[in-house]
């Protein structure tokens, strides 16, 4: 078994891995899906010799087919994060904090600050501009369903830019990505409040 040596995301050369499996039906290489998030010691892949023994030349051919870097773990590059929550009267409040913090902790990213502001562009823009961490996460009181909604507008007002609006995942398609200087900004979808697997 190939185990993760730390947290990260699995990156693979699918053609190389398929070539390994094509060498001989007695050699099987099974992996987690591409871009699977892994924790330390999580099983990334398993290699089996079904017949228990094979000629050395067959094993060497499988190794050659894999080449270098066919399967690797991309470690987190961000160290710390700020979570900004927008709120409305009777809203969810900080209900998603624990789920977001759990995801960050699994990647060895420290949640340094949690800020709650009214669900309006101006106070949100101030909070975004004041954040000093590598990553700024925005969890809004209502779904960000338009490029000119509260959170994307606030990011632009703070001097940042929206680099991607919407994601082809479900749940989680109301996510947006942005940048403010060197800081990455992610507008989280409402499903981020749940600890269940989703696009967040």
Task: Tell me what each language-model feature is.
Residues 1-76:
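Extended, charged alpha/beta regions that create polyanion-binding interfaces
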Residues 8-13, 46-53, 78, 103-106, ...:
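Generic detector of short, locally flexible boundary/turn motifs and exposed helical patches
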Residues 9-10, 52-53, 90-91, 193-195:
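Short, acidic Gly/Pro/Ser/Thr-rich loop/turn segments
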Residues 33-39, 78, 95, 99, ...:
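Conserved active-site and cofactor/substrate-binding residues in soluble primary-metabolism enzymes
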Residues 42-48, 104, 108, 132, ...:
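Structural signal for hydrophobic packing residues in well-ordered secondary-structure cores
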Residues 51-136:
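Phosphate-binding glycine-rich loops and their immediate beta-loop-alpha structural context
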Residues 88, 95, 112-200:
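Short glycine/threonine-rich loop/turn motifs
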